[in-house]
């Protein structure tokens, strides 16, 4: 595996441009006889959500007192991976369409974990771009897992993340991608404060763009895990609900962050193990 990186400049300043933009993004191996690398993608971009089946809107939201962030209840539902025949930007692996059923509801962060929350829980400030309400970046899978555990939660599964990212809608969004996500055309090569773009149908922010987000699922190589959603570095072709990267758990890059999830609200687990759902 090879990771393309940008030199980091002390003080959180934007470094000079190096080569073309694709070379400044994280890129991972893709089966190719010529040995080239690219981002792996598996599904449609935001504008191809018409095939997603309808679902009830998200339910209640709560603040986790351990990190101070708001979490949204996402109902069960189903969606399709893969691209529509008319989508000309699909990668080869996206041609296969498959129905995914998320059988149980779950809680998920309304935003990416912020730097203020990360400092509060982990007593650490690893981020390259600085700002209390900016997403925590340069966070590895192991770090993200530890954070979620400390607040009584976990990383979402890839299917949970995708279902949440679709927003429970069967209609093509009327908003352009730029109103939903910080990505290559509008980011100015930096992350941005969370929740400054429009929410999706479940009320979630920045599911696409800003920073890649770790999920539980194992990746392509030994010990690797999956990253979702694209980042401020990526173009619309890579900022897809089912686009994915596979990376080692100790990868800490400045366009990588996360959000937490849980099947049960942490404060509603009793000593007997019974739970309360919304």
Where does each model-flagged region fall?
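Bacterial N-terminal signal peptides that target proteins for export
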Residues: 31-42
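Bacterial N-terminal signal peptides
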Residues: 41-50
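A short glycine-rich, aromatic-capped structural motif
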Residues: 62-127, 209, 257, 264
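Functional-site microenvironments in short loops/helix caps that host divalent-cation chemistry
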Residues: 64, 80, 84-89, 127-245, ...
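Short, charged low-complexity linker/loop segments at the C-terminal edge of domains
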Residues: 264-275
